């Protein structure tokens, strides 16, 4: 396979959030869909032997948080995906800042009950400085949550970035009915996938089928959805790929990482909206990825995973995709 084709199928993104927003749980659900793991370990309940795959240090297993950046790779629908799972806790932010230098885009995870939090703001500013496209996943809709319009307003006012909801929640917590896909014009009805399982038995209803939709979610939720759709279509920003790529507009998705609801839809929309790695700039101009010289940026050195050091690097140039220097 040629170097050019290898580049085109790659997607490298970081996941950023405030602690406990669900970042590591979302990462594991991505790995489930890529077939990299068969059972997701929730970051809750660390007294058991089941831990999150991206949390490999003993302190991470004990505390249920990420304290170092993990680099995870899997294949999905023809894409080779690299996830940079970054620490959310402020004490370990230096590792996060360095890792963001290697990301082509970022997924910002927000707790629906808490909104934009302190560490999210700090990490967001780093992404803005680097002009990284940012995609927002508003998590934990299966719990009590803030009003979705208020969440959008908070993202825009606090972070200073325009929002474009790609899907829209119907209820929350015990009354969470599902999400409306604004692009596909259908409703995915909520049903949780528990115990780390991959499959979600999702029923999808055409949004124009009023009788069926009312039967599934009830008259009150149906009427509220129609009001929300009308307001969104009239007031929210339209999707603009150039603005997304420039980091001026963030597509917003709602779901629940813990119950695996909305994760696959988010992943597929995300892959369709992102681009393959672009040539990097240096103080001597744009770096040609097809040059014969080898160059890379080492953004992490891990000495604790096993006896041998493992370096994580962003490859700038290489004569061959199978170059032994990079193996």
Regions found by a protein language model. Name each.
Residues 1-318, 322:
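Structural and coupling elements of P-loop NTPases
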Residues 324-327:
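N-terminal low-complexity segments that are often proline-rich with Ser/Thr-Pro
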